[in-house]
């Protein structure tokens, strides 16, 4: 949605109430926070409903909005609880929820049709078809992938129906958002459930190649304004109030003055938090120098700034009109430019001795105490008939009711009924992805015998052989769409019938090409609601998230990845490149962690990389459990011909092959 030249919203983080106060003090237009559940920062302090209510009222009093993250992937039994939680958020007046799970988005839209939804960056939206597909779900705003160049951001803004939000400052993941399984499958802490252990910050055989410097686009403010994005987002719900205030204050100034940061302002940003400097490499497409770690100097600078800072509460100055007249209830109206509220109190009585005085009434009305309001006596317009009495407790009650009503953001919330979602039987199929198509050719006889569909990378020449389905690359930017569309048309004309959909945007691309879409595990289907919604969008069947255990896959339905090295990361940067790209990628490139585990890295289309798991998911020795699955999926990547043949024999012919290092589905079988 184009807004060229309009000043975008400055959206700031808050992990606790002090950080929220700091964001408002710094000049935030909106603040985003997490609740105690269903948020992607499970280890932040976060907010309970009472704190959310207080924070929301504080934001609204100061002309800011409050968004709440409900952006983890959900299991079937959690959808109803999450929907009821969203109803509570709606009731207290939250401006929008930020979501990742397609099943939850569908449930919210059905139960709370006017509740604003923003699509989390975890949905991996990186092009216009993706943004429009998400918009069709009832989502107003899309948070784009952080890895996009400015030209690609501009294209989505210009061509999509959705509002566009981009990240402005803060921590960067080396993996495309929503696509990282490293912490989950290696360490048991699921990033898509808010538990990321940040293995990317650890050293590997190539050094700290997974640890990126923090993002800072302070040098690109004029271009970002001109791009027409609706919102610029600062990361940092795990950061201190001092960090939030400093970063918000500087970007507020830069936006208002429509200029890039000075050297002094960059230095101040670095003092707030830095990993050896900042990077703008994704926006500019210049990846050199993107990695960095926290030095002792960085840590000391942040500690010193945090120790000096106390946010404090800014009280909202309001005005009042009060009327106390014989025979009528006393009234008090509080008002500002943005809102007003009238409270009705007790009926005054004729005074027996000392009647009310204007000064005494104003004195009591101005005592706003622990509220968020300030009401100076000079801001009170009082109409007072003489000879009347209203007790101090009655005046205080009138003031309390007026303050509470003025602060309140509550709205009527409908009683919600959980949308019915009958379990859809899993469609029977056995599929395989060969990331090295020459391996598919080598074991061709077995493929024809045991697999319904075999997928090969779209841009490999095997994709035009006519007998394979095509694996659409997980990242396709607007600048790459024409190449992908052309290649899909060529594959279709050559005889391809199916496409492996690894991103929500591919639903449109596959439909345009006339191909049957199979949803890859990267669509992050973890519940039957999401699976049903993808079917409604045109996906024939989905492969469950690789994070689901076998019992969880029975709840959601869908295909299960029973074999293969699961891709843990999809990176925009190429680890194999040394200087100018020769186009000849090494066949045996990997990273090794401190325990000696080796993670193979293979080339993805567009000079991107896939980091594969060190351990192979293997289940052939559990034939009873596996044979009960209606749909199974295999991934072949680093195997040689002999290994691939042995794997196929183990699953389909009773062979005794057992890999050296293997793991089970999800976290256990």
Residue map of PLM features:
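Surface-exposed amphipathic alpha-helical tracts and adjacent flexible/coil segments at the periphery
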Residues: 1-26, 30-42, 53-56, 62-90, ...
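A cross-family signal for key residues in well-ordered alpha-helices
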Residues: 106
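Glycine-rich, highly charged phosphate/nucleotide-binding loops
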Residues: 47-52
């Amino acid at each position: 949605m184009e807004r060229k030249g309009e000043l975008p919203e400055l959206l700031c983080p808050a992990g606790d109430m002090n950080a929220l106060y700091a964001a408002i003090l710094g000049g935030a237009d909106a603040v985003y926070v997490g609740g105690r559940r269903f948020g992607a920062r499970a280890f932040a302090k976060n907010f309970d409903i009472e704190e959310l209510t207080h924070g929301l009222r504080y934001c609204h009093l100061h002309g800011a909005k409050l968004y709440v993250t409900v952006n983890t992937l959900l299991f079937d039994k959690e959808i109803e609880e999450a929907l009821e939680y969203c109803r509570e958020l709606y009731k207290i007046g939250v401006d929008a929820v930020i979501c990742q799970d397609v099943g939850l988005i569908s449930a919210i839209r059905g139960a709370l049709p006017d509740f604003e939804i923003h699509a989390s960056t975890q949905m991996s939206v990186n092009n216009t078809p993706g943004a429009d597909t998400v918009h069709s779900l009832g989502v107003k705003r899309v948070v784009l992938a952080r890895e996009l160049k400015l030209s690609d951001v501009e294209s989505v803004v210009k061509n999509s129906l959705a509002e566009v939000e981009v990240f402005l400052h803060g921590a960067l993941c080396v993996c495309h958002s929503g696509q990282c399984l490293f912490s989950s499958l290696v360490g048991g802490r699921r990033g898509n459930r808010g538990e990321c252990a940040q293995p990317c910050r650890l050293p590997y055989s190539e050094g700290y190649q997974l640890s990126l410097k923090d993002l800072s686009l302070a040098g690109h403010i004029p271009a970002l304004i001109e791009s027409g994005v609706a919102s610029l987002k600062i990361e940092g719900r795990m950061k201190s109030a001092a960090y939030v205030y400093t970063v918000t204050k500087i970007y507020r100034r830069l936006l208002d003055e429509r200029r890039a940061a000075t050297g002094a302002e960059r230095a101040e940003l670095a003092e707030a938090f830095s990993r050896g400097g900042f990077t703008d490499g994704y926006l500019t497409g210049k990846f050199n120098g993107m990695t960095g770690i926290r030095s002792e100097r960085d840590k000391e600078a942040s500690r010193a700034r945090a120790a000096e800072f106390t946010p404090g509460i800014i009280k909202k100055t309001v005005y009042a009109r009060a009327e106390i007249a014989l025979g009528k209830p006393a009234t008090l109206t509080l008002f500002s430019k943005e809102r007003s509220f009238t409270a009705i109190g007790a009926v005054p009585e004729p005074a027996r001795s000392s009647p009310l005085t204007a000064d005494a009434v104003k004195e009591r009305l101005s005592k706003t105490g622990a509220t968020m309001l300030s009401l100076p006596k000079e801001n009170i317009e009082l109409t007072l008939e003489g000879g009347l009495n209203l007790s101090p407790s009655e005046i205080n009650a009138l003031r309390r009711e007026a303050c509470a009503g003025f602060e309140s953001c509550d709205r009527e919330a409908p009683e919600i009924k959980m949308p019915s979602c009958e379990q859809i039987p899993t469609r029977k199929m056995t599929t395989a992805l060969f990331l090295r198509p020459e391996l598919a050719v080598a074991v061709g006889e077995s493929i024809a015998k045991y697999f319904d569909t075999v997928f090969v990378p779209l841009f490999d020449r095997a994709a035009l052989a006519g007998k394979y389905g095509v694996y659409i690359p997980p990242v396709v930017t607007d600048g790459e769409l024409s190449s992908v569309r052309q290649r899909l048309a060529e594959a279709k004309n050559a005889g391809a019938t199916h496409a492996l959909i690894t991103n929500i945007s591919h639903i449109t691309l596959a439909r345009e090409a006339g191909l049957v879409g199979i949803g890859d595990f990267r669509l992050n289907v973890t519940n039957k609601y999401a699976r049903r919604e993808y079917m409604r969008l045109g996906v024939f069947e989905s492969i469950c998230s690789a994070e689901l255990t076998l019992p969880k896959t029975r709840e959601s339905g869908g295909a299960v990845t029973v074999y293969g090295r699961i891709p843990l990361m999809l990176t925009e940067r190429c680890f194999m490149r040394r200087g100018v790209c020769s186009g000849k990628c090494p066949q045996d490139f990997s990273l090794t962690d401190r325990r000696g585990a080796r993670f193979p890295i293979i080339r993805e289309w567009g000079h991107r990389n896939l980091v594969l798991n060190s351990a192979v998911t293997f289940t052939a020795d559990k034939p009873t459990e596996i044979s009960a699955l209606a749909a199974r999926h295999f991934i072949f990547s680093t195997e040689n011909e002999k290994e691939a043949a042995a794997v196929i024999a183990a699953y389909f012919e009773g062979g005794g092959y057992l890999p050296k290092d293997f793991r089970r589905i999800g976290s256990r079988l």
